[in-house]
């Protein structure tokens, strides 16, 4: 599997993926720091909540759509799928490598954005943001990303990059309303795109040490973790089984 991941990394050389992963967090967090350093009245909690609401509900769904879609689009451009068929390359490992590489790319992008935000605010504005707390929230949001990454990979293989990006935009709209407002209090568990923003808020709640509040939402926290793992496993298994038995479709026109 390591060799498959190394190949995936080499394929992204001089591609859009590396620009997305390494440049977008610099731009987004840089803009956030540029705005926040002049707002002395904003609390650390507001910074935390605002950043992860925007990042997890907006950036992640669209980013997942672009990353998974573009990875498959590049394979179509290079005719790699026909090479896989003719050379007998392990399809299961190939599919899993795409999934793992997508997760790693999203994780690097998220952690980089958080580190830039925290360092920028701590150096330029003396906010004393807890980097450990923000990194923990990033990890939780990435766990919440697993199901939608598995879903988008299936969409990308079957329908192409355009459909994956379109689904990401729809996911962003749904996550914004369902994941960040009271509208989705009773239906968020049916919307995987809301999981990242819900998961990212857990570390702050845990740090509050409010036993009464924690007791009220402990079941939701457990459900979030359970759904993230189970749904990602289900969609990943479905994707692997489908890809292992399918005829490759040409999506170069998408």
Walk through the language-model features, giving the residues of each.
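Terminal transmembrane helical anchor/hairpin motif
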Residues: 41, 46, 171-250
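Pore- or pathway-lining transmembrane helices of multi-pass membrane proteins that form conduits
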Residues: 20-25, 161-180
């Amino acid at each position: 599997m390591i060799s498959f991941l190394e190949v995936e990394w080499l394929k992204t050389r001089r591609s859009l993926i590396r620009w997305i992963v390494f440049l977008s967090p610099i731009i987004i967090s840089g803009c956030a720091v540029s705005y926040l350093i002049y707002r002395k009245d904003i609390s650390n909690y507001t910074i935390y909540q605002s950043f992860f609401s925007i990042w997890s509900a907006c950036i992640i769904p669209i980013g997942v759509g672009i990353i998974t879609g573009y990875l498959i689009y590049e394979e179509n451009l290079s005719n790699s799928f026909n090479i896989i068929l003719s050379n007998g390359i392990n399809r299961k490992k190939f599919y899993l490598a795409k999934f793992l590489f997508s997760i790693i790319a999203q994780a690097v992008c998220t952690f980089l954005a958080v580190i830039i935000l925290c360092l920028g605010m701590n150096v330029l504005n003396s906010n004393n943001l807890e980097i450990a707390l923000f990194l923990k929230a990033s990890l939780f949001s990435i766990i919440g990303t697993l199901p939608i990454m598995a879903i988008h990979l299936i969409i990308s293989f079957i329908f192409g990059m355009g459909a994956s990006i379109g689904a990401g935009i729809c996911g962003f709209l749904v996550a914004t309303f369902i994941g960040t407002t009271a509208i989705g209090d009773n239906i968020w568990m049916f919307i995987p795109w809301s999981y990242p923003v819900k998961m990212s808020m857990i570390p702050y709640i845990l740090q509050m040490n409010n036993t009464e509040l924690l007791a009220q939402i402990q079941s939701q926290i457990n459900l979030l973790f359970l759904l993230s793992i189970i749904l990602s496993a289900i969609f990943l298994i479905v994707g692997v089984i489908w890809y292992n038995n399918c005829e490759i479709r040409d999506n170069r026109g998408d």
